[in-house]
Amino acid sequence: MPDLLQLQVHDLEVEILTGIYSEETHLPQPLRISVTADIDIPERFAPDTPLSASKSYIDLKHAATDGLPKDVHFTLIEGVADHIADTLFISDSRVRRVEVRIIKLAIAERDESIGITLVRHRR
């Protein structure tokens, strides 16, 4: 099994047009998104290894925030997760696996975390 590097960003809060109920379809819904991307890596990271041998965390953050279309309504949050995964796969051929966790903040009570985790592998 090849070595991989897991890059992670957690608990990004965004507002996206999503939902199936009438009270959800007109206003952006608050979501908390976490992303993990597994990428191919060199055999070793020397002290002077350039960033190009890895991947910037900013790429993951962008895919889960500014990379999401603001004018598109996603019926399901699974569609939001797929959009994030697709963005990361398209942007870097070294990305092997993407895991996206989305929590719907509008329906959570107290300390609940209600949402989904989608895992996609490069095909």
Enumerate the language-model features and the residues they cover.
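N-terminal, polar/charged subdomain of small-to-medium soluble alpha/beta proteins
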Residues: 1-123
